[in-house]
Amino acid sequence: MEWTIQAGTSVFEQLRTQVIEAVRDGRLATWAKLPTVRGLADELGIAPNTVAKAYRLLETDGVIETRGRAGTFVSAHGDAIDRQAQLAAAAYADRIRDLGVSPEDAVALVEAALRA
């Protein structure tokens, strides 16, 4: 996998996003092995703690699994983020209906929140 780091966004978030996108579009298959923290940090010229933070967040989200010395792999539950997003959207829709907000206004609120 090719990694790109750009100014303007935190590096750990860029790494996290790139892994999620690669899992979603199939560039990273289930059980694909990711580079070691130190190896990826050296490759990108960044601090190992930055890679470790991205990996921790991805593991919390269920996208990857770390198996000690065996390494870090794409989880069989790599689509967990999509499921979490669907659950969040459903909860939001329920709350919006309870408040009597129109669908158009609800979409505008979400778009504004995503831009913030």
Where do the model's predicted regions map?
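Conserved beta-strand edge residues that scaffold enzyme active sites
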Residues: G71-T72, V110
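Short Asp/Glu-rich motifs
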Residues: A41-D42, H77-G78, R115-A116
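A surface-exposed regulatory interaction patch that couples sensing to output
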Residues: S75-R83
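Short, flexible active-site-adjacent loop segments at beta-strand->alpha-helix junctions, enriched
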Residues: T9, A70, G78
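Beta-hairpin "wing" of winged helix-turn-helix
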Residues: R27-A32, L57-R69, S75-A76
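Extreme N-terminal segment that seeds HTH/winged-HTH DNA-binding domains in transcriptional regulators
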Residues: M1-K33, R83-A116
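N-terminal helix-turn-helix
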Residues: K33-I64
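Short alpha-helix boundary/capping motifs
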Residues: E43, A47, G68-A70, A85-L87, ...
